[in-house]
C-alpha cells in the first residue's frame, strides 16, 4: 500500500466520522413527540436543506401521505401522524428519489438522499410547468386568421383549455405512449391522442376547430425535443424561508375512475363552520357517488346524488371517440348530476350546483308564463340548478 492510498483512506474515514458526528449532533437537537417521525437528511454532499420528506401509508381507509421540508441543517419532523406503518423517503431538486425506509410514529429516522447523477435525472421531478414552458409558440402570421390572436391561443392552451383538466408537462403529457399506435410523425400521434376517451370530441374540437389545428405542430415539436433529450431551461429553486414551514397532508379518496372538480369544507364567509368536519367533493361528470372525506379519522365514504327526472342526460351516454391508453373504450364517466361548486352555509348544510332534469324547462319557466320570474327572464333550457344535500 503506498502513502497516497493510505492518505486517501484516512481522509475518507475522517470525512465519514465528521459526517456521522454532525448527524448525531443535529439529531440530538430534534425533539419528537410520540406521533412524530423525524431525523436528518444527508447525501454525499452533506446535509440536504430544502428537500421534501414524505411519510406515506396504505394502512388507513384512505391512502395517506404527509410531506415536510428540511431546514438548513437537513433536519425534519413529520408531525402528528395517525398510528400506522409508514414508508419514508426523500425528494428534492438536484436529487434522485431516495429508497423507501420503514418507520413508525415516535421513530428517529436519518435518511440518505441520492444526488442526481445527471441533469436529466434531476429534471424528472421538476414541476410540470418547467416542462410545459419548453413548448414553442406560433408566429403572428400563423395566428393571423385566429380571432383574438395570441391572447386567445394562450388562453385555450393554458388556464381555460388544456391546463383546466391536465397537468401539462408531467411525465404522462410530455411523452407519447406507444399504446397509441404507429404514426408517420408525432403530429399525427397528437391528433390521435386528443381523441382518446369520452372527452375526445371536446379536446379535438378545442384544438382543431377553436385553434384551427395550430397547436398540433407545436405539441409534436415539444414532445419530439423532449424525447431527443432536451431539458427545461427553468431550474426551480428549493423551498426557502417560510416555504419550509409548510406541512402538506395528501389523501387519495373517491374512485380511480372518478375525478374531483371541486371540494368544500366550510362556509367561506365564516371559516370556523364545520371545523374538523367532513370534506365534500364534487366529481362533476365522472360519477354520482359524491365522495366524503373525514380528515380526522381518515375515512372515505360517499353518498349517491339522485336526479328528479329519469330522462336527465348522463355522461355515460357519450362514447369514447378513440380508445384511451388507460381505460380502452370503457365509459368511465357516468354522472347525471354533473355537479360543480359544493358550498357550505352558515349551518353546515351542503349545497351543490347540479343537473337534476333534462334541459327543457317546465312551462312555467318559459316565454308566455305568468310566473314573475319567467316574465322577467324566461328560459327554455337550463343546465345546472341549485341542489341541497338532504
Where are these regions (language model features)?
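Short, acidic Ser/Thr/Gly-rich low-complexity loop/linker segments typical of extracellular
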Residues: 31, 58-77
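Short, ordered, surface-exposed loop/turn motifs in non-cytosolic proteins
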Residues: 35, 43-59, 63, 83, ...
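Short Pro-Gly-centered beta-turn/loop motif in secreted/extracellular proteins
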Residues: 48, 77-85, 93
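A short, solvent-exposed loop/turn motif at the edges and junctions
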Residues: 57-63, 85-102
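The canonical Cys-X-X-Cys-His
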Residues: 159-170
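Short, conserved, GDST-rich strand-edge loop motifs in beta-rich repeat architectures
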Residues: 172-179, 281-285, 352-389
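Surface-exposed loop and turn segments in beta-propeller and other repeat-based domains
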Residues: 241-259, 301-334, 380-390
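Residue-level detector of Asp-centered blade-edge/turn motifs that repeat once per structural unit
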Residues: 274-275, 344-347
Amino acid at each position: 500500500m503506498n502513502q497516497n492510498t493510505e492518505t486517501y483512506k484516512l481522509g475518507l474515514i475522517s470525512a465519514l466520522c465528521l459526517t456521522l458526528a454532525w448527524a448525531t449532533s443535529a439529531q440530538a437537537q430534534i425533539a419528537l413527540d410520540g406521533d412524530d417521525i423525524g431525523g436528518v437528511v444527508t447525501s454525499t454532499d452533506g446535509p440536504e436543506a430544502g428537500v421534501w420528506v414524505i411519510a406515506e401509508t396504505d394502512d388507513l381507509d384512505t391512502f395517506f401521505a404527509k410531506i415536510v421540508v428540511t431546514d438548513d441543517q437537513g433536519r425534519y419532523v413529520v408531525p402528528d401522524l395517525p398510528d400506522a406503518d409508514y414508508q419514508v423517503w426523500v425528494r428534492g431538486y438536484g436529487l434522485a428519489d431516495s429508497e423507501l425506509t420503514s418507520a413508525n410514529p415516535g421513530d428517529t429516522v436519518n435518511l440518505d438522499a441520492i444526488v442526481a447523477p445527471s441533469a436529466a435525472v434531476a429534471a424528472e421531478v421538476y414541476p410540470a410547468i418547467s416542462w410545459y414552458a419548453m413548448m414553442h409558440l406560433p408566429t403572428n402570421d400563423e395566428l393571423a386568421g385566429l380571432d383574438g390572436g395570441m391572447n386567445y391561443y394562450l388562453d385555450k392552451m393554458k388556464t381555460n383549455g388544456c391546463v383546466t383538466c391536465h397537468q401539462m408537462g408531467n411525465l404522462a403529457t410530455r411523452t407519447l405512449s406507444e399504446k397509441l399506435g404507429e404514426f408517420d410523425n408525432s403530429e399525427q400521434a397528437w391528433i390521435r391522442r386528443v381523441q382518446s376517451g369520452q372527452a375526445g370530441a371536446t379536446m379535438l374540437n378545442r384544438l382543431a376547430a377553436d385553434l384551427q389545428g395550430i397547436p398540433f405542430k407545436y405539441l409534436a415539436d415539444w414532445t419530439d425535443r423532449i424525447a431527443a433529450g432536451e431539458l427545461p431551461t427553468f431550474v426551480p429553486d428549493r423551498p426557502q424561508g417560510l416555504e419550509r414551514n409548510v406541512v402538506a397532508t395528501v389523501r387519495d379518496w373517491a374512485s380511480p375512475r372518478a375525478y374531483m372538480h371541486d371540494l368544500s369544507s366550510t362556509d367561506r364567509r365564516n371559516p370556523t363552520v364545520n371545523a374538523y368536519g367532513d370534506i365534500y367533493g364534487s366529481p362533476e361528470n365522472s360519477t354520482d357517488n359524491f365522495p366524503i372525506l373525514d380528515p380526522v379519522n381518515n375515512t372515505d365514504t360517499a353518498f349517491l346524488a339522485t336526479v328528479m327526472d329519469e330522462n336527465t342526460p348522463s355522461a355515460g351516454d357519450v362514447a369514447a371517440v378513440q380508445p384511451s391508453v388507460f381505460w380502452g373504450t370503457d365509459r368511465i364517466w357516468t354522472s347525471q348530476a354533473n355537479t360543480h361548486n359544493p358550498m357550505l352555509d352558515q349551518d353546515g348544510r351542503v349545497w351543490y350546483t347540479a343537473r337534476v332534469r333534462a334541459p327543457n324547462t317546465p312551462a312555467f319557466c318559459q316565454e308566455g308564463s305568468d310566473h314573475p320570474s319567467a316574465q322577467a327572464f324566461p328560459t327554455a333550457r337550463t343546465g345546472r340548478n341549485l341542489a341541497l344535500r338532504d
